[in-house]
């Protein structure tokens, strides 16, 4: 490698952005084909390619940052800005769903019966499974903070335990949400109530699955001694993302489940 007189990371050419883009194309086209023609082949191919891309891209970043030392303080600063901007874009993504919900619920049209929830819709009880889900996610926010403090204090065993607990709580949330969807008395096809409910809570659920995966990668890295008390941005990014998912759920719970019912 040629000598460089600066602290910035000159990235080597990589095939993963291309394979990631192809995976996204296959998954979105596959989704449309699944909806219209009931075939999941293309979507499955896209998912497999996406998982392969994720694995190999993350592997390369771990090699560059942990083993080759390319993640100098200025590079880490850039990664921090990148993660902050990404979470900001996600805030606006969810803002669209809240806008749709409040637009529909604050001035219900005569077609909806002039009331909210619309005529014929039986909303879910906010004090049953949704309240338990809120408690589960808030507890996971506590355990991920515990993991962060453990890493900063060099408490390896505690960090592993608290991270594993956070992932288990995330999986428990996902299982409860799946059960709630299965037993819901309305579907995504039930007018604007069904659409806004399932799209907003469904995308949040997807983000919980992504966050759990992110934390699972951090757990594997922590087990393999990748994180030190000074050098653990991968975990920090995962923790920020998890707190974001937490806050979005609180807004969803208060707006759609509690006020909306």
Curated annotation (Swiss-Prot):
Coiled coil residues, start to end: none
Mitochondrial intermembrane-side segments: 35-40, 106-128, 184-190, 257-261
PROSITE patterns with a match to the protein in the record: COX3
Keywords: Membrane, Mitochondrion, Mitochondrion inner membrane, Translocase, Transmembrane, Transmembrane helix
Bilayer topology: Multi-pass membrane protein
Molecular-function GO terms, alphabetical: cytochrome-c oxidase activity
Topological region Mitochondrial matrix: 1-15, 67-72, 153-155, 224-232
Enzyme Commission number, as recorded: 7.1.1.9
Superkingdom field: Eukaryota
Record has Transmembrane helix as a keyword: yes
EC class (word): translocase
GO biological process: mitochondrial electron transport, cytochrome c to oxygen
Catalyzed reaction equations: 4 Fe(II)-[cytochrome c] + O2 + 8 H(+)(in) = 4 Fe(III)-[cytochrome c] + 2 H2O + 4 H(+)(out)
Bilayer-crossing regions: 16-34, 41-66, 73-105, 129-152, 156-183, 191-223, 233-256
CDD domains named in the record: Cyt_c_Oxidase_III
One Pfam family this sequence matches: COX3
Gene Ontology, cellular component aspect: mitochondrial inner membrane; respiratory chain complex IV
Compartments it resides in: Mitochondrion inner membrane
PANTHER family: CYTOCHROME C OXIDASE SUBUNIT 3, CYTOCHROME C OXIDASE SUBUNIT III
Function recorded in the entry: Component of the cytochrome c oxidase, the last enzyme in the mitochondrial electron transport chain which drives oxidative phosphorylation. The respiratory chain contains 3 multisubunit complexes succinate dehydrogenase (complex II, CII), ubiquinol-cytochrome c oxidoreductase (cytochrome b-c1 complex, complex III, CIII) and cytochrome c oxidase (complex IV, CIV), that cooperate to transfer electrons derived from NADH and succinate to molecular oxygen, creating an electrochemical gradient over the inner membrane that drives transmembrane transport and the ATP synthase.
Annotated family: Belongs to the cytochrome c oxidase subunit 3 family.
Assembly information from the UniProt record: Component of the cytochrome c oxidase (complex IV, CIV), a multisubunit enzyme composed of 14 subunits. The complex is composed of a catalytic core of 3 subunits MT-CO1, MT-CO2 and MT-CO3, encoded in the mitochondrial DNA, and 11 supernumerary subunits COX4I, COX5A, COX5B, COX6A, COX6B, COX6C, COX7A, COX7B, COX7C, COX8 and NDUFA4, which are encoded in the nuclear genome.
Protein's recorded name: Cytochrome c oxidase subunit 3
Organism the protein comes from: Cyprinus carpio
């Amino acid at each position: 490698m040629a000598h460089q007189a600066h602290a910035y990371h000159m990235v080597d050419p990589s095939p993963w952005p291309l394979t990631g883009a192809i995976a996204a194309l296959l998954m979105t086209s596959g989704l449309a084909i699944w909806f219209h023609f009931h075939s999941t082949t293309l979507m499955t191919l896209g998912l497999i390619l996406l998982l392969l891309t994720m694995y190999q891209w993350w592997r390369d970043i771990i090699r560059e940052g942990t083993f080759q030392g390319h993640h100098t303080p200025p590079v880490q600063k850039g990664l921090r800005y990148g993660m902050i901007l990404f979470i900001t874009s996600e805030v606006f993504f969810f803002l669209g769903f809240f806008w749709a919900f409040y637009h529909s619920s604050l001035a219900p049209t005569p077609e909806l019966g002039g009331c909210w929830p619309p005529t014929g819709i039986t909303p879910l009880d906010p004090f049953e499974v949704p309240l338990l889900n809120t408690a589960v996610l808030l507890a996971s926010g506590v355990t991920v903070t515990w993991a962060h403090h453990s890493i900063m204090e060099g408490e390896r065993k505690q960090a592993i335990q608290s991270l594993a607990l956070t992932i288990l709580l995330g999986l428990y949330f996902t299982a409860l949400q799946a059960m709630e969807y299965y037993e819901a008395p309305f579907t995504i096809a039930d007018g604007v109530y069904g659409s806004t409910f399932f799209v907003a809570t469904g995308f949040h659920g997807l983000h919980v699955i992504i966050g759990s995966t992110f934390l699972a990668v951090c757990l594997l890295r922590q087990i393999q001694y990748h994180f030190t008390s000074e050098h653990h941005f991968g975990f920090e990014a995962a923790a920020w993302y998890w707190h974001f998912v937490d806050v979005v759920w609180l807004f969803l719970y208060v707006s759609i489940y509690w006020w909306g019912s």
